[in-house]
Structure formats: structure tokens, C-alpha cells
């Protein structure tokens, strides 16, 4: 049974920021509501109310909606127009396709002086002889009836024939009430028959269940050990048999002819609810429970697990003597949903309850490890120092040598020349014995005579000028 709750109204009040006390428009159609309640207390400022395609059997609890202008109750189980006198601002009322057989109940709308439009098509009263004339004459404030404008001449004729038309309407109402009483009795009888059939079926299945229990008690012990293998097959067969029976019952229900009455609509709703519950029950049985993820074997060996299916990179930083894990965690995920646990031989990261575990290539120090998260990519970086320290010598840095264009040319020319294995005699390391004693003695530089300047014989026109000092 669908009920009007505060949560239901709030979910349909998103256009008003889920505030219900100031709502002016509310739509509760197709919610399987069977009773009107709470709306007049929670939403007193309503102007438009949609309640079509439900199972409402009576108009009630709307008398406090003074500002209500449009009320839609089409496709419901309403049999009488009532309790609308308090809706002072009502201008449009839609009661299409209901079960209104008491046409005289429209007299309760005479106090709604602002009512301009009324829809009663699809109701049993709309088939009465003189239906339109009676409504037009009774509700003189109406401008439209069933989408057709009421003309002045039509109202004058209806008022003239009102006593005769009213008498005919009363006779047809009595005939409809008798027919309706028979329909109710027939529906009650069918309901009792179905309940008795259901009780018989339950008792039959209960006896069958006891028989299976007795049979299982007489089985040998070695069969009991195989019970866990046979049970799923038996259960699957029972589920299939139940599905087949339910399918047959469903076909029988939908193929069975029935009258269009409020009881038949309620019966259809109950049948659909039962189908939905059975389907949910079967789906729960078929649903396989996942076994818990094994992270460590029985012998204490850790396993590699990546249940969240995240990309990762594991680097061995020899320079800093540590292992770095870069885990591609979702960028906009809250850090509180991540839990890191570093062990000497493996690292475990819980991402939203899903484990990521990786075995490390070397033993690390859990106390010295740390984790940080990138603010740009959201990746999680875990740095884990190794246990064994490695001493690495510092490498001398070579000074940069400036290169000149001449040196580069010399290097290219040297590379182009052919290198031979002959040794230059001037670069020998063996001393020259012949030149140990010098024959000529070197005179001091001051004692040495100045060289004479001899004019060049090659130039015949040379004339020596004594005034010019020698160029030494």
C-alpha cells in the first residue's frame, strides 16, 4: 500500500529546494497511493495538486487547502464527490475515469463559487440519460464541462427541464447502486476462494517439506558428507519448478476475464506487488555471495592483489636507497577513504574498502616510510627506505673546457690525418752521447759583438743615410 509520507513529498519538491511548507505545486501521480492524508497539514499553500493514476478511493483531508486552484484526481477509485467544500479557491477539478455513480453528489460543489471547469468523462454517471443537463443546471458557476464550453441557451434549457431530469437521474442511481452491491459481493466471494486456495497450497507444501526432512534423516553418513554438492542442484530444481508454477499462475490471472471495478484494480495491484516480492526473493537466492579476498596464504605468504584495478608503478631509487610506489588513485576521491599499511616485505593500500597489495623486491623500513598525495593528479606516492644501506662514492665533476673555433678546427684536422706508429726522433727519451761535450763555447750576451749591418745586395737603388739610426 502506497502512503503519503514526508520523505515522498520532499523527493517531489526539488523545484522548491525540498521545502514542503511553502510548496505551491505538488505532483504525486503513479505512486500507488490508496489514501489522501497529511497534505492539508504539511502543504497548506498548495495551488496545484496532481494525484492522477493512483488508487485513491475517497476524497478526504483536503478541506484546509484554501488556496488550491487545480486538483487532478483522474484514474482513481473515487465513487463519490465529497469533502471539497473547504477548497474555496478551486477553479478546476479533474475526475476523469473514476467510479462515480452518485451523480447527485455534484451538489456538494455548489459552494465552490470559483469552480469553472469540471471533468467527469469516463465515469459511470457520464452514461446516465440527462447527465450533462443535470450538471449544467446544478452547478451554475461552471463554464466548461468535459472540455466543452457551456452556452447560455444550454443552461436555460437545462434549468427548465431540471425536475424531470433529476427524477431520471435518481432512478438510474438506484439501479447502479444495486449493481454495485452485487459486484462487491462477487469480489468478496472471489477473495475468500483465493484465500482458501492459498491456505491449502501452503499446507500441501508444508507436508512435502516434512517428508523431505524425514528422508534426509534416514540417509547414510557418507551421503551427508556429499550434501554440500547435491544441495545446490536440488535448490536450483526447486527454484525452476517454482518459477514455472508462478508463470502459469500469472498467465491464468491475466487471461481471466474480470469487470472494471475498484476491487479489480486493487486485486491487480496486489498481484503485481506479489510478483515483485517473489522476483526479489528469487534474485536474492540466485545472488552469489563473493568469497572474502585472500591477501595472505595459510603459510603466511603475501599475495599480489589489485581489486580496485588501479594503475601503478614501482621504482627502485638506488640513489636514495628506497623503493617508490606510485598508485594512480582517483583524482577527486577523498583522502580519508585511503588507508596505507607498509610491512617489511609488502605494502597494502585500502581504497574505498578494496585492497591493493604488492610484494616488495627488497625489505624496507616501515617506521621510516611515508606517503603523500599529489595535488594535481591525485596519485598516491609511498616512499619506503630499504633496510640494507649502500655506500656510493661521490663522482668528481669534470670542469667544463671552453672550446674555441681554432681548437675545434685543429681537432678536426687531427682526426682527418692518418696516424702512424713511427716515433719522432726528437722526442726520444735516450740521451745523445755525441753531443755531451760542446765544442763551441757560448759567449756572454753582453760581450758578443754587434752584428754589422750589410746592405742588401739585391736592391741596387739602396742609399745609406747616416742620419738615420740603425734598426736594431
From Swiss-Prot:
It is found in: Cytoplasm; Cell projection, Cilium; Dynein axonemal particle; Cell projection, Cilium, Flagellum. Residues 305-406 form the CS domain. This is Dynein axonemal assembly factor 11. It comes from Bos taurus. InterPro entries: CS_DNAAF11_C, Leu-rich_rpt, LRR_dom_sf, U2A'_phosphoprotein32A_C. One of its GO terms (biological process) is inner dynein arm assembly. Belongs to the tilB family. PANTHER family: CILIA- AND FLAGELLA-ASSOCIATED PROTEIN 410-RELATED (PTHR18849:SF0), LEUCINE RICH REPEAT PROTEIN (PTHR18849). Interacts (via CS domain) with ZMYND10 (via C-terminus). PROSITE patterns: LRR. Involved in dynein arm assembly, is important for expression and transporting outer dynein arm (ODA) proteins from the cytoplasm to the cilia. Acts as a crucial component in the formation and motility of spermatozoal flagella. LRR repeats lie at residues 20-44, 46-65, 66-89, 90-110. SMART domains: LRR_SD22 (SM00365), LRRcap (SM00446). Pfam families: CS_DNAAF11_C, LRR_9. It comes from the Eukaryota. The keyword Cytoplasm applies. GO terms for cellular component: apical cytoplasm; cytoplasm; cytosol; dynein axonemal particle; extracellular region; motile cilium. Keywords: Cell projection, Cilium, Coiled coil, Cytoplasm, Flagellum, Leucine-rich repeat, Repeat. Residues 456-466 have a biased composition (Acidic residues). The keyword Coiled coil applies. Residues 128-146 form the LRRCT domain. Residues 187-210, 265-291, 398-472 are annotated as: Disordered. Residues 177-202 form a coiled coil. Residues 187-202, 265-283, 407-430 have a biased composition (Basic and acidic residues).
Amino acid at each position: 500500500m502506497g502512503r503519503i509520507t514526508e520523505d515522498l513529498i520532499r523527493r517531489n519538491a526539488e523545484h522548491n529546494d525540498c521545502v514542503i511548507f511553502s510548496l505551491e505545486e505538488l505532483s504525486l501521480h503513479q505512486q500507488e497511493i490508496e489514501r489522501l492524508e497529511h497534505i492539508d497539514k504539511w502543504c497548506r499553500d498548495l495551488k496545484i495538486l496532481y494525484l492522477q493514476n493512483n488508487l485513491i478511493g475517497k476524497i478526504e483531508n483536503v478541506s484546509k487547502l484554501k488556496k488550491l486552484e487545480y486538483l487532478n484526481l483522474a484514474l482513481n477509485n473515487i465513487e463519490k464527490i465529497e469533502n471539497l467544500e473547504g477548497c474555496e479557491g478551486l477553479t478546476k477539478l479533474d475526475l476523469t475515469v473514476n467510479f462515480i455513480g452518485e451523480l447527485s453528489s455534484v451538489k456538494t460543489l455548489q459552494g465552490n463559487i470559483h469552480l469553472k471547469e469540471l471533468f467527469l468523462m469516463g465515469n459511470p454517471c457520464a452514461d446516465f440519460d440527462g447527465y450533462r443537463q443535470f450538471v449544467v443546471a446544478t452547478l451554475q458557476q461552471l463554464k466548461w464541462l468535459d472540455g466543452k464550453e457551456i452556452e447560455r441557451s444550454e443552461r436555460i434549457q437545462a434549468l427548465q427541464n431540471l425536475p424531470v431530469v433529476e427524477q431520471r437521474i435518481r432512478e438510474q442511481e438506484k439501479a447502479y447502486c444495486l449493481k454495485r452491491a452485487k459486484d462487491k459481493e462477487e469480489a468478496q466471494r472471489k477473495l475468500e476462494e483465493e484465500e482458501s486456495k492459498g491456505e491449502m497450497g501452503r499446507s500441501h507444501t508444508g507436508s512435502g517439506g516434512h517428508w523431505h526432512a524425514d528422508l534426509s534423516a534416514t540417509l547414510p553418513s557418507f551421503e551427508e558428507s556429499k550434501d554440500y554438492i547435491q544441495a545446490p542442484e536440488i535448490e536450483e530444481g526447486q527454484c525452476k519448478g517454482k518459477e514455472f508454477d508462478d508463470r502459469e499462475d500469472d498467465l491464468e490471472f491475466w487471461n481471466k476475464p474480470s469487470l472494471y471495478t475498484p476491487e479489480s484494480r486493487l486485486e491487480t495491484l496486489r498481484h503485481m506487488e506479489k510478483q515483485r516480492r517473489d522476483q526479489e526473493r528469487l534474485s536474492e537466492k540466485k545472488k552469489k555471495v563473493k568469497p572474502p579476498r585472500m591477501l595472505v596464504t595459510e603459510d603466511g605468504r603475501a599475495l599480489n592483489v589489485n581489486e580496485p584495478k588501479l594503475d601503478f608503478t614501482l621504482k627502485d631509487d638506488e640513489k636514495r636507497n628506497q623503493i617508490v610506489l606510485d598508485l594512480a588513485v582517483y583524482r577527486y576521491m577523498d583522502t580519508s577513504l585511503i588507508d596505507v599499511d607498509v610491512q617489511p616485505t609488502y605494502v597494502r593500500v585500502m581504497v574505498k574498502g578494496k585492497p591493493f597489495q604488492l610484494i616488495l623486491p627488497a625489505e624496507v623500513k616501515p617506521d621510516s616510510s611515508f606517503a603523500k598525495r599529489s595535488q594535481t593528479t591525485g596519485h598516491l606516492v609511498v616512499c619506503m627506505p630499504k633496510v640494507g644501506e649502500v655506500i656510493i662514492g661521490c663522482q668528481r665533476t669534470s670542469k667544463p673546457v671552453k672550446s674555441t673555433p681554432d681548437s675545434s678546427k685543429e681537432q678536426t684536422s687531427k682526426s682527418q690525418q692518418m696516424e702512424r706508429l713511427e716515433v719522432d726522433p726528437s722526442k726520444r727519451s735516450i740521451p745523445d752521447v755525441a753531443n755531451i761535450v760542446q765544442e763551441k763555447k757560448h759567449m756572454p750576451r753582453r760581450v758578443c759583438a754587434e752584428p754589422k749591418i750589410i746592405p742588401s745586395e739585391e736592391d741596387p737603388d739602396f742609399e745609406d743615410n747616416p742620419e738615420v739610426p740603425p734598426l736594431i
